Amino acid sequence: MALTKAEMAEHLFETLGLNKRVAKEMVESFFEEIREALESGEQVKLSGFGNFDLRDKNQRPGRNPKTGEDIPISARRVVTFRPGQKLKARVEAANSGKK
């Protein structure tokens, strides 16, 4: 199951006592700030969580899986996420007891 923005807003409503509209606006505003920073070419660093980086990928050869035809894959810019040490440690600790 995935965590949604609506669930995040609901959590803010329940834990901080914000009204639902304000909680939803806070979540939307948070993600809009991240989007705008990435669109303008900035790195996003969330201490204790991780970093969102932009990475330029060069054009490379590819293949159409249906026809087998060789086709070039265009150069593009992609967003990558690198989890921070604290996040990695918490996920590892949470998953170590599940096996």
Swiss-Prot record:
One of its GO terms (biological process) is DNA recombination. It comes from the Bacteria. Residues 49-71 are annotated as: Disordered. CDD domains: IHF_A. Pfam families: Bac_DNA_binding (PF00216). Keywords: DNA recombination, DNA-binding, Transcription, Transcription regulation, Translation regulation. Gene3D superfamilies: IHF-like DNA-binding proteins. SMART domains: BHL (SM00411). The keyword Transcription regulation applies. InterPro entries: Hist_DNA-bd, Histone-like_DNA-bd_CS, IHF-like_DNA-bd_dom_sf, IHF_alpha. This protein is one of the two subunits of integration host factor, a specific DNA-binding protein that functions in genetic recombination as well as in transcriptional and translational control. Belongs to the bacterial histone-like protein family. Heterodimer of an alpha and a beta chain. This is Integration host factor subunit alpha. It comes from Shewanella denitrificans (strain OS217 / ATCC BAA-1090 / DSM 15013). The lineage of its organism: Bacteria, Pseudomonadati, Pseudomonadota, Gammaproteobacteria, Alteromonadales.
